[in-house]
Protein backbone atom coordinates (compact mmCIF):
# COMPACT_ATOMS: atom_id res chain seq x y z
CA UNK A 1 0.00 0.00 0.00
CA UNK A 2 1.31 3.43 -0.94
CA UNK A 3 0.99 6.51 1.22
CA UNK A 4 -0.63 9.75 0.14
CA UNK A 5 -1.42 12.82 2.20
CA UNK A 6 -2.81 15.49 -0.09
CA UNK A 7 -4.30 17.74 2.56
CA UNK A 8 -3.52 21.44 2.02
CA UNK A 9 -0.89 21.43 4.79
CA UNK A 10 0.71 18.10 3.86
CA UNK A 11 4.45 17.82 4.50
CA UNK A 12 6.89 17.71 1.62
CA UNK A 13 7.82 14.32 0.16
CA UNK A 14 5.16 12.38 2.09
CA UNK A 15 3.38 10.74 -0.85
CA UNK A 16 4.75 7.52 -2.29
CA UNK A 17 1.89 7.51 -4.80
CA UNK A 18 2.80 10.93 -6.20
CA UNK A 19 6.45 9.92 -6.09
CA UNK A 20 5.64 7.14 -8.54
CA UNK A 21 4.19 9.64 -10.99
CA UNK A 22 6.90 12.29 -10.59
CA UNK A 23 10.03 10.11 -10.33
CA UNK A 24 12.31 10.19 -13.33
CA UNK A 25 12.21 7.19 -15.63
CA UNK A 26 15.85 7.37 -16.68
CA UNK A 27 17.38 8.78 -13.49
CA UNK A 28 17.15 8.44 -9.73
CA UNK A 29 16.42 11.50 -7.61
CA UNK A 30 20.19 11.75 -7.07
CA UNK A 31 20.85 12.05 -10.81
CA UNK A 32 22.34 8.55 -11.08
CA UNK A 33 21.15 6.68 -14.18
CA UNK A 34 18.69 3.80 -13.86
CA UNK A 35 19.46 0.56 -15.66
CA UNK A 36 17.26 -0.83 -18.44
CA UNK A 37 15.01 -2.87 -16.12
CA UNK A 38 14.73 0.01 -13.64
CA UNK A 39 13.64 2.32 -16.46
CA UNK A 40 11.08 -0.22 -17.68
CA UNK A 41 9.79 -0.63 -14.11
CA UNK A 42 9.34 3.13 -13.75
CA UNK A 43 7.46 3.32 -17.06
CA UNK A 44 5.25 0.49 -15.83
CA UNK A 45 4.65 1.97 -12.38
CA UNK A 46 3.36 5.22 -13.85
CA UNK A 47 0.88 3.32 -16.03
CA UNK A 48 0.04 0.87 -13.24
CA UNK A 49 -0.73 3.60 -10.70
CA UNK A 50 -2.92 5.40 -13.24
CA UNK A 51 -4.67 2.11 -14.09
CA UNK A 52 -5.38 1.37 -10.43
CA UNK A 53 -6.83 4.86 -9.96
CA UNK A 54 -8.88 4.61 -13.17
CA UNK A 55 -10.30 1.25 -12.14
CA UNK A 56 -11.22 2.62 -8.73
CA UNK A 57 -12.78 5.80 -10.11
CA UNK A 58 -14.65 4.32 -13.06
CA UNK A 59 -15.16 0.66 -12.11
CA UNK A 60 -13.44 -0.58 -15.25
CA UNK A 61 -11.38 -3.75 -15.64
CA UNK A 62 -8.60 -4.52 -18.13
CA UNK A 63 -9.52 -6.39 -21.31
CA UNK A 64 -6.00 -7.83 -21.54
CA UNK A 65 -3.75 -8.57 -18.62
CA UNK A 66 -4.65 -8.07 -14.98
CA UNK A 67 -3.52 -5.92 -12.10
CA UNK A 68 -2.02 -8.98 -10.40
CA UNK A 69 -0.01 -9.88 -13.51
CA UNK A 70 1.18 -6.29 -13.96
CA UNK A 71 2.20 -6.04 -10.30
CA UNK A 72 4.02 -9.37 -10.58
CA UNK A 73 5.89 -8.14 -13.66
CA UNK A 74 6.80 -4.92 -11.86
CA UNK A 75 8.30 -6.89 -8.96
CA UNK A 76 10.23 -9.22 -11.27
CA UNK A 77 13.39 -8.88 -13.32
CA UNK A 78 12.12 -10.06 -16.71
CA UNK A 79 12.40 -7.00 -18.98
CA UNK A 80 9.97 -8.40 -21.55
CA UNK A 81 7.32 -9.09 -18.91
CA UNK A 82 7.73 -5.55 -17.55
CA UNK A 83 7.43 -4.02 -21.03
CA UNK A 84 4.40 -6.16 -21.92
CA UNK A 85 2.70 -5.19 -18.65
CA UNK A 86 3.44 -1.51 -19.33
CA UNK A 87 1.89 -1.75 -22.80
CA UNK A 88 -1.21 -3.51 -21.47
CA UNK A 89 -1.66 -0.99 -18.66
CA UNK A 90 -1.19 1.92 -21.10
CA UNK A 91 -3.80 0.41 -23.40
CA UNK A 92 -6.20 0.04 -20.47
CA UNK A 93 -5.61 3.66 -19.45
CA UNK A 94 -6.41 4.96 -22.93
CA UNK A 95 -9.71 3.05 -23.25
CA UNK A 96 -11.72 5.93 -21.83
CA UNK A 97 -9.97 8.72 -23.73
CA UNK A 98 -13.05 9.45 -25.83
CA UNK A 99 -15.55 9.12 -22.99
CA UNK A 100 -17.41 11.99 -21.40
CA UNK A 101 -17.32 12.29 -17.64
CA UNK A 102 -18.05 14.98 -15.11
CA UNK A 103 -14.86 16.91 -14.48
CA UNK A 104 -13.57 17.25 -10.96
CA UNK A 105 -11.30 19.98 -9.69
CA UNK A 106 -8.27 21.26 -11.53
CA UNK A 107 -5.00 19.45 -10.98
CA UNK A 108 -2.28 21.20 -8.99
CA UNK A 109 0.97 19.88 -10.41
CA UNK A 110 3.13 22.14 -8.24
CA UNK A 111 1.59 20.75 -5.04
CA UNK A 112 1.63 17.18 -6.39
CA UNK A 113 5.36 17.47 -7.05
CA UNK A 114 5.89 19.05 -3.61
CA UNK A 115 4.35 16.06 -1.79
CA UNK A 116 5.96 13.44 -4.10
CA UNK A 117 8.30 11.03 -2.28
CA UNK A 118 10.90 10.50 -5.03
CA UNK A 119 13.37 8.70 -2.76
CA UNK A 120 10.91 5.83 -2.26
CA UNK A 121 11.25 4.94 -5.97
CA UNK A 122 15.07 5.15 -6.07
CA UNK A 123 15.24 1.47 -5.13
CA UNK A 124 14.34 0.52 -8.73
CA UNK A 125 17.80 1.02 -10.21
CA UNK A 126 18.63 -2.10 -12.28
What are these regions (language model features)?
Residues 1-126:
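Soluble extracellular-acting proteins and domains
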Amino acid sequence: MLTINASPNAPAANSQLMGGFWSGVSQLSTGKKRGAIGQAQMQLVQQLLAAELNASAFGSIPATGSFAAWESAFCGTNANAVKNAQQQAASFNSQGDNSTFTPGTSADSKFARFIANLLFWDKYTN
